[in-house]
């Protein structure tokens, strides 16, 4: 094979490899304080992030309700609570907007201590819908807790 054809073939292969592999990162973690029994929690309040325009608060509340928890989402948190749920959602643009990362933390309502926390991180090539990411984070938290 002449040198020009070999160089062209290698350049083409390099271009294809560079454009098709990308950074596909998929990471999901959860930690739960060993002294905490998440099964004993009954009433939770999901605190809205000030910049949440994507309805993540509602998704989290719906998923927790489907697990049997009593969940509120209003701006005022009720006085009788077992936990406050906070979250941080990070979004990126890649042709369309997608959620890059979601962190959900279940906190003690009295002192804000994190009882359990989970995180889901998916780059563009492994992106999930917001609902799927909420599911993934909560499933990992409750799996880690043994509930």
Model-identified regions with their sequence ranges:
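C-terminal/domain-edge helix-coil "capping" segments
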Residues: 24-38, 60-65, 70-71, 121-147
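C-terminal motif of bacterial Sec signal peptides marking the signal peptidase cleavage site
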Residues: 19-22
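Solvent-exposed loop/turn segments connecting transmembrane beta-strands
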Residues: 49-57, 95-97, 124-128
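Amphipathic beta-strand/beta-sheet edge segments enriched in Tyr/Trp
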Residues: 96-122
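An anionic, turn-rich surface loop/hairpin at beta-sheet edges
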Residues: 86, 94, 115-131
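Bacterial N-terminal signal peptides that target proteins for export
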Residues: 1-10
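N-terminal segment of the mature soluble domain
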Residues: 35, 39-87
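N-terminal post-signal-peptidase region of extra-cytosolic proteins
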Residues: 86-92, 101-102
């Amino acid at each position: 094979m002449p040198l020009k054809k070999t160089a062209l073939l290698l350049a083409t292969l390099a271009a294809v490899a560079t454009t098709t592999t990308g950074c596909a990162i998929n990471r999901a973690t959860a930690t739960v304080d060993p002294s905490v029994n998440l099964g004993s929690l009954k009433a939770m309040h999901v605190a809205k992030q000030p910049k949440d325009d994507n309805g993540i608060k509602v998704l989290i509340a719906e998923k927790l309700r489907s697990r049997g928890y009593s969940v509120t989402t209003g701006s005022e948190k009720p006085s009788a609570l077992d936990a406050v749920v906070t979250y941080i959602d990070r979004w990126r643009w890649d042709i369309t907007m997608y959620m890059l990362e979601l962190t959900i933390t279940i906190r003690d309502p009295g002192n804000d201590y994190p009882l359990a926390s989970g995180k889901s991180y998916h780059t563009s090539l492994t992106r999930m819908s917001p609902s799927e990411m909420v599911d993934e984070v909560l499933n990992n938290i409750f799996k880690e807790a043994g509930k």
